[in-house]
Amino acid sequence: LPVEAVVDLVGPATRWVAVTGSSNAVGTIPDTAAITAAAHTAGARVVVDGVHLTPHRPVDVGTLDCDVLTTSSYKWYGPHAGIMWVEPGLLESLSPYKVRPAPDAGPGSLQYGTPSWEGLAGIDAAACFLLDVGLEEIAAHETERFARLLDGLHEIDGVRVVGPQDAADRAPTLMFEVAGKSPAAVAELLADAQVAVWDGHNYAVEAMIPLGLDAEDGAVRAGISVYTTDHDVDRLLAAVADVVDRPVSA
């Protein structure tokens, strides 16, 4: 996401700018600090969608200088839950849609009743896990495995990696196509080989067409996590190479 693609839309009437911290489709990490600076110069607030960024990179709201950061713990080994950091003092000035009995201000205005205490326990455990392993260590581990995956896919004839072609400055997520086979067919064949991937648009529908993909079919998505090993990557590459060699009717 080029900075100018967002900044050029910002004007005197802009009140909020929403930008992704990282693409869940192809892993790109935009220069959110530059976008935030331009938005603030225009008098706008900024909310960063950090759902796909948080599990893969250390996130510092001070460096991002955003007003709101959102994430979800299901992306970092916890339960499904929405988490939002808000610049101190800002929440009191907001008027969110809320259920009638909820308070008019404070965090309670964004909640819908009794919290999921068991979910909060899971979030705490997941956060402790990330901190115990180390966010920098996780990023280094994932980047090394991701480079292995990306280089391996580039070496397989009939495979096209969608989006950026190198492993630098991105989350360890990519999309790829196999010539002559639909993404759904590729995912099914890989599942037969006990390799789990995702296919489709990954809810990033607007990004599919600029990437040269069908808006519904999308592509095959694969990614690296803290527990991914070199062996896992090699199994995926071997399975993809096998899929390429299979006849279309398969």
Regions found by a protein language model. Give the residues of each.
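Pyridoxal 5′-phosphate
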Residues: 1-250
